[in-house]
Amino acid sequence: MALPCKTGAAFKKYLLLLAQENCEFRLPEIKSLLSLYGGHFNNLQDEHGKSPFCILNLPSEEMARKLMKRTVCAKSVFELWGHGKTFMEFQQSVLSYPLENMMSYLQPNSTYKIIIHSFNKTLTQKEKLEKINTMEFIPFQGKVNLQNAENIFYLLEDYGSDPNKAPNEPFEIFFGRWIADGQRELINSYSVKKRHFIGNTSMDAGLSFIMANHARVKPNDVVFDPFVGTGGLLVSSAHFGAYVCGTEIDYNTVHGLGKATRMNQKWRGPDENIRANLRQYGLEKYYLDVLVSDASKPVWRKAPLFDAIITDPPYGIRESTRKTGTQKEIIKTELFPESHVPVQLNYHLSDIFSDLFAFASEFLVTGGRLVYWLPVYRPEYTEEVLPRHPCLKLISNCEQMLSSHTSRRLITMEKVKEFEEKYQYAHLGEGQNLPYKGHNSFREKYFSGLKKRTAREERARSEMANAENVKSKGKEDV
C-alpha cells in the first residue's frame, strides 16, 4: 500500500498522511520540497496511487518539520514505529523498533494519548477503544491525557480505495508518533472567495500553493508570471517570502478597471488590483510591479533575472489569447502619436508555449524552475506533444481533469543549461506543439465535446418525451 524509499543507515522512517484531493500532485510536491531542503525521494508511489499513506526515509525530524511548514498536499507526518499487513506482522514490526528511540516518550512523568485514524471506513467508538487496548504491548508508563497530551500517537489503518467495499480487516496498519501537521489551512485562509480582487479565471488557492512548491519558491527569490491576470499565483509565492512581478496585456485587468466578476457588483472598485490583494494578506512588501506588456515581446534586460516562472497561460476558453501586432506594415514617422495603442492579434497556443520556453531558457537562473499549465485534448494526448527545449529538463507532469475529453497538465521544468545563442530558435523545432497550431485550436476541441454531449442529452430527452407520448396515447386508446 505505502511505498518506502531507499533506506540509509542514518535515516529514520517517517509516515506521511496525504490529502485525498489533487492526488497526482502530491508526490511531485513532496519530492520538490525535499530537494529544496537537501533531501531525496528516490521511489514514487506507483502502486495504489490513491493511498494516503507514504513512507519516507529522512535524515532528521527537523527536515520532517520543514516539509510540513510548506506542503499543502500532506495532512500530517509521523515518526513511524512500525507497520504491517496483518496484526501479528504489525506487532512484530513495532517491537523491533529500537527501544532507545521510544523511551523518551514513554516516561512516567509524561502524558500521552492514542488517536485512531481509519481510511475509507467508519469505526464506532467501541471499535476504536478495542483497537487502542490492543496496543498494550507497548510499555507506556505515562498518564493518559486526552485534552493536552505531551506525546500524541496515531494508529492508522488503510481499508483500500473503495469505501463501499471496505474489508473487515485493514490492508495495512501503521503506528507512529505525531510530529507536525501540514499547511492545509492556507487553502481556506487564502480562498479566492475571500479575496479582494478576482477575475473569471483566478487560480484556486490550493493549486497556487502547489505550483509555488513545485517551483521550490524560497525567501528572497524573484518570481515572475508573464500572464499574471489577477495575480493569484503571485500571492502564494509572496507568502513564502519571494518578491513577485509579472506582465499582463489587458490594461483594465492590471489597473482594476471595467466590469466586476462578482455577482451583484457591476463595476470594479477603485482599489481592486493585484497590489491590494497582497496588501490584504500583509504581503505588500514583496510586490515589485506588474506591467501592461505583451508576453510575446519581452521588455527585460538580457540576463537570468528570475528564480522561478510560474504561470497559467490563456487557453482561449474564458480568456482570449492575444498579442500586440498588425497584419500590415506601419511606417512610423515623426508625427506618429506617442499615445498610439497597438492593435491586438490572435495569439496561437503553439506560439504561446514556444515564446514561454524561449523566455524561460533565457531569463531563468540555472536551477530555476518553470511551472505552467498545458491544456490537453485527451484523445490526442501523448508525452510527445509536450513542448521541449534543450535548456529545460522535465521534472513532473500532473493531470487535472476538466471534462471527459479535456484536461490540463501541470508541467514543471528545470533550467539545466546556460542559454546560448545557438538555442535561440530551439523551441521552433519541427513537429513541436502540433496539437496547438491554429487560433483557438484547444477551444474548438473543448466545445466540440461539449456540443456532442449536449446533443446526446437532447436526443435522450426527446426519446423520453416520445416514449411518454406513446404511453399516454396507449392509455387513451384503452
UniProtKB/Swiss-Prot annotation:
It catalyses: guanosine(10) in tRNA + S-adenosyl-L-methionine = N(2)-methylguanosine(10) in tRNA + S-adenosyl-L-homocysteine + H(+). Keywords: Cytoplasm, Methyltransferase, RNA-binding, S-adenosyl-L-methionine, Transferase, tRNA processing, tRNA-binding. GO terms for molecular function: methyltransferase activity; tRNA (guanine(10)-N2)-methyltransferase activity; tRNA binding. One of its GO terms (biological process) is tRNA processing. CDD domains: AdoMet_MTases. The keyword Transferase applies. Transmembrane segments: none annotated. InterPro entries: DNA_methylase_N6_adenine_CS, RlmKL-like_Mtase, SAM-dependent_MTases_sf, tRNA_mtfrase_TRM11. It comes from the Eukaryota. Its main location: cytoplasm. PROSITE patterns: N6_MTASE, SAM_MT_TRM11. It is found in: Cytoplasm. It is an enzyme of class 2 (transferase). Residues 457-478 are annotated as: Disordered. GO terms for cellular component: cytoplasm; tRNA (m2G10) methyltransferase complex. The keyword Translocase does not apply. Its EC number is 2.1.1.214. Disulfide bonds: none annotated. Belongs to the class I-like SAM-binding methyltransferase superfamily. TRM11 methyltransferase family. Part of the heterodimeric TRMT11-TRM112 methyltransferase complex; this complex forms an active tRNA methyltransferase, where TRMT112 acts as an activator of the catalytic subunit TRMT11. Catalytic subunit of the TRMT11-TRM112 methyltransferase complex, that specifically mediates the S-adenosyl-L-methionine-dependent N(2)-methylation of guanosine nucleotide at position 10 (m2G10) in tRNAs. This is one of the major tRNA (guanine-N(2))-methyltransferases. This is tRNA (guanine(10)-N(2))-methyltransferase TRMT11. It comes from Xenopus laevis.
